[in-house]
């Protein structure tokens, strides 16, 4: 979420792409919860103009599924096809089954992926953290797991019926993993992702602090373990940052009132390397596939290294550790559950199209 245009007090294209370079990412996909929403050619062109002016890494914009992301009327998908990586209303679930079916039919016709934030508003009931032990013992309103997996089950059925290429954003529950695993066995064209925070933290780690609040929320140990199992057996195709910056004020209101979302561009690789490669859970090559190759394959972006061609390269020191200090981030967002955690794997340099766009001062 690069937040520009419309929410530049949270993040800008410049600061967000600098954060990406600092974290070792050469390509990022920009979600459409902007103002104006990229739901037609004109609003998308405004976003593209700003990307051309300010981005220091490759930015691939999403087009919105619905007009204004209101979930009522299909956006002008045809007009946006040449410039968008996929279509999504990320940040909101598409509540209407008929609209989702129409969107999938159009995406199949256009040869584009539909990526969904799955959340059934009827089941939210004002919740803002996982509906588990912590919510009950600390008198918080919980978000039930079914609000996610119920909509995934609906969408998988629609994808099977329409033949749409369907992608599930930020999976967080064990039921979601099971539904997607079974869909893949049936041959449904579905992929999914999760984020480092869902693979690392659970509701047991919650504190009364906005840096632990995101959507979907941190779930139970069982859910976290199911996500890891999904990585190992191939059900979960990729790990993404779900970088969602907010202002300092918006994240300083505790669990109940803080905005939902945490930053991730500058910690994601190191967090996953520390949790999975160092202890031998995953080989480095598998992590690279989850964070780089698989997204490139699915979404059709990026280029391969070739002699004589401008290169996108990232240099990491995999033996160097550091303590996460959010005040050192290049992102305007500071809220992360990894604050104060020691991680291994430091990005030393990022090169885009043969030009160094970020490097450590001591390099």
Task: Label each residue range with its predicted role.
Residues 49-65:
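A glycine-rich helix N-cap at a beta->alpha junction
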Residues 25-27, 57, 85, 237:
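Short acidic/polar active-site loop segments enriched in Thr and Asp
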Residues 1-54:
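Metal-associated gating/positioning segment near the N- to mid-region
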Residues 20, 24, 59, 87, ...:
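Divalent metal-coordination and catalytic microenvironments
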Residues 137-165, 232-233, 237-239, 244-318:
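His/Asp/Glu-enriched, well-ordered alpha-helical/loop segment
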Residues 254-257, 307-362:
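C-terminal cap of metal-dependent C-N hydrolases
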Residues 1-11, 32-34, 60-73, 91, ...:
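Active-site mouth loops of central-metabolism enzymes
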Residues 74-239:
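Histidine/acidic residue-rich metal-binding segments in metalloenzymes
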């Amino acid at each position: 979420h690069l937040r520009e245009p419309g929410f530049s007090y949270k993040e800008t294209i410049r600061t967000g792409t600098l954060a990406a370079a600092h974290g070792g990412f050469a390509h990022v996909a920009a979600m459409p919860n902007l103002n104006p929403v990229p739901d037609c050619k004109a609003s998308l062109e405004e976003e593209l103009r700003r990307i051309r002016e300010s981005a220091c890494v490759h930015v691939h914009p999403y087009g919105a599924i619905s007009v204004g992301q209101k979930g009522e009327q299909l956006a002008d998908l045809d007009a946006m096809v040449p410039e968008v990586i996929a279509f999504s209303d990320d940040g909101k679930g598409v509540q209407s089954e008929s609209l989702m079916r129409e969107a999938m039919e159009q995406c199949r016709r256009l040869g584009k992926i539909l990526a969904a934030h799955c959340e059934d508003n009827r089941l939210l009931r004002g919740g803002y953290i996982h509906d588990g032990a912590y919510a009950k013992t600390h008198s918080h309103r919980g978000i039930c797991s079914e609000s996610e997996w119920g909509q995934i089950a609906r969408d998988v059925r629609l994808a099977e019926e329409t033949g749409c290429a369907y992608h599930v954003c930020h999976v967080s529950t064990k039921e979601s993993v099971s539904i997607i695993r079974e869909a893949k066995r049936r041959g449904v064209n579905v992929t999914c992702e999760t984020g480092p925070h869902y693979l690392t933290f659970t509701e047991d780690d919650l504190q009364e602090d906005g840096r632990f609040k995101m959507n979907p929320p941190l779930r139970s140990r069982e859910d976290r373990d199911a996500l890891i199992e999904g990585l190992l057996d191939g059900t979960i195709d990729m790990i993404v940052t779900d970088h969602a910056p907010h202002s300092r004020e918006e994240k300083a209101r505790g669990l109940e009132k803080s905005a939902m979302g945490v930053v991730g561009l500058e910690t994601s690789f190191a967090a996953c390397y520390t949790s999975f490669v160092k202890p031998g859970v995953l080989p480095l090559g598998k992590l690279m596939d989850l964070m780089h190759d698989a997204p490139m394959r699915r979404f059709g972006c990026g280029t391969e290294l070739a002699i004589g061609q401008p290169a996108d390269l990232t240099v990491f020191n995999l033996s160097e550790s550091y303590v996460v200090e959010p005040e050192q981030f290049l992102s305007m967002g500071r809220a992360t559950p990894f604050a104060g955690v020691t991680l291994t794997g430091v990005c030393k340099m990022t090169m885009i199209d043969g030009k160094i766009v970020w490097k450590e001062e001591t390099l």
